[in-house]
């Protein structure tokens, strides 16, 4: 493992430049697609906030949460209905969209609708899966497994980059710390730059308590601002956050989702911090 601060390959993502020389971008939305109206309302509110702050924005939501704690938990509307709703978000709100895919997902069908594909953390070691997703040619956000050392993400990124797809990002979402708990090692954000890919920090899954409620995961959303500030202070290209108008009633990951009505205040702070950090060379 090197101590060298490696700059990511700059590239255009959904029409805006990404990298440490460019402003922080945001990937945000509810964990899972609940209703079309909720998706449109949330995307519209986030677009208004980010437009006002000059933050590039990608809307995210899942049509199938395949790794829920319980088989009885809500997984989403399914691919056909989920893609229809995401297409409506693109059409009506005018923002790019991201969703996660799985080993049995018809990748080309999803890629025909969404702008960015995301690979789940639990699947980061699956070589065929990672390369099949990258082979769609779409930008890919590679989630780091909760079990994986940050320096091992270079192997995951290399698998994706070997396909010829240069639009690859790596995402930190916390590391297992005993049972039912995650912590964020901020050193990983610097280490993961050695992949040569833009680094994204997932500020909401990082406060998740996996399986902490028995048949569902818990979370400590009160720590989202502290961890998000720390990550931006280290220097990142993008921030990933799950948000919901009423997190306590969200159908998935409510305990670690940030309230939509508090997004503007947090993003104002983070945007200011990002400009300060990127005004000088990283040490």
From Swiss-Prot:
InterPro entries: Aldolase_TIM, DAHP1/KDSA, KDO8P_synthase. Signal peptide: none annotated. Pfam families: DAHP_synth_1. It is found in: Cytoplasm. Its EC number is 2.5.1.55. It catalyses: D-arabinose 5-phosphate + phosphoenolpyruvate + H2O = 3-deoxy-alpha-D-manno-2-octulosonate-8-phosphate + phosphate. It comes from the Bacteria. GO terms for biological process: keto-3-deoxy-D-manno-octulosonic acid biosynthetic process. The keyword Transferase applies. SUPFAM superfamilies: Aldolase. Keywords: Cytoplasm, Lipopolysaccharide biosynthesis, Transferase. The keyword Transferase applies. One of its GO terms (molecular function) is 3-deoxy-8-phosphooctulonate synthase activity. Its main location: cytoplasm. Pathway: Carbohydrate biosynthesis; 3-deoxy-D-manno-octulosonate biosynthesis; 3-deoxy-D-manno-octulosonate from D-ribulose 5-phosphate: step 2/3; Bacterial outer membrane biogenesis; lipopolysaccharide biosynthesis. GO terms for cellular component: cytoplasm. Belongs to the KdsA family. This is 2-dehydro-3-deoxyphosphooctonate aldolase. It comes from Methylococcus capsulatus (strain ATCC 33009 / NCIMB 11132 / Bath). The gene is kdsA.
